Design a protein with these regions (language model features):
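12-transmembrane solute porter fold
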Residues: 37-38, 62-232, 242-271
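Intrinsic disorder in cytosolic terminal tails and internal cytosolic loops
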Residues: 266-282
Length: 282
């Protein structure tokens, strides 16, 4: 019927090549040199295949990534905020134990327990947060503001780690991110789903999950590039490790602050307008 079959593996192949073309150069650019023909060629391949993937998906019956949804401005806002809200986790999961062990000098056991209080928070708080968010539409943007703010500020605080810093700072900071994660889990996906037509909810939800996974992959590559830039000369030097870890945390915090700005100046007016329309319709 002149339509591209969604059973074709071509879409998935284009996506894999596009992501590899971008993520691999980000991971190895520091060690191989950013002007290396291999690195530059990888970026070129990534860009070309990204364009090809978008063109292919635009004509697919059931695309892997529904391009048409990006024309929905409200939905796009929530996808971007969700993407940003996941970004800091690449710093938290990898570089908090690294900083605790190699900069502060804590034991492996203490470093391994850093996220234990955070885990407890994320087990119980989402129930309370979800009940609060569901009371009225205005609480949705407040939940997103809490999510971004309580993800950004702990990362910024951890960005000033020194050998004399107490490991208690990491415990407190990561516990606060547990509060952020609890509010993220009950706000991003429901808010995005509310912007979609019933027939688009399934694939729209899948796209949100894809954006979250992509955020983690990009974060790992970018943070690895930053850390390697400081430690490539001497990976065992404490000062180099400290500078690398701190820069990673500050970068994660700065990116999440961008998410907070988006919530305050894009998502908030959008949801307040939507709430006003709901009142008028009633």
């Amino acid at each position: 019927n002149g339509r591209i079959s969604n059973e074709s593996p071509l879409g998935m192949a284009l996506l894999v090549v596009a992501l590899c073309g971008i993520l691999l150069p980000l991971s190895y650019g520091m060690s191989m040199g950013w002007t290396s023909p291999i690195i530059l060629g990888g970026f070129a391949i990534g860009i070309v295949f990204t364009v090809l993937f978008i063109k292919y998906e635009s004509g697919a019956d059931q695309p892997i990534i529904p391009v048409k949804l990006f024309r929905n401005r409200n939905y796009l806002a929530f996808v971007l905020v969700g993407f940003i809200c996941y970004f800091y986790r690449g710093a938290m999961d990898v570089y908090s134990p690294l900083g605790a062990i190699n900069v502060m000098g804590t034991s492996n056991g203490v470093a391994g327990a850093l996220q234990f209080p955070r885990t407890i928070v994320t087990m119980f708080l989402p129930v309370i947060a979800g009940a609060w968010v569901g009371k009225k539409t205005a609480n949705m943007w407040k939940a997103l503001a809490i999510t971004t703010a309580l993800s950004a500020f702990p990362m910024l605080a951890m960005g000033f780690t020194t050998p004399t810093t107490s490991v208690l700072l990491y415990f407190i900071a990561l516990t606060i991110t547990g509060v952020a994660e609890s509010y993220r889990g009950v706000s991003i996906t429901p808010a995005a789903q509310a912007c979609l037509k019933p027939e688009d909810i399934g694939i729209g939800t899948a796209l949100i999950n894809f954006a979250n996974s992509l955020s983690c992959s990009l974060a790992a590559a970018i943070f690895g590039m930053i850390y390697s830039g400081f430690t490539v000369a001497d990976p065992t030097n404490v000062a180099n490790i400290q500078n690398g870890v701190n820069t990673v945390f500050l970068t994660a915090g700065a990116i999440t602050v961008v998410g907070l700005v988006l919530v305050l100046f894009w998502v908030r007016p959008m949801l307040e307008e939507q709430a006003g329309e709901d009142i008028v319709s009633v």
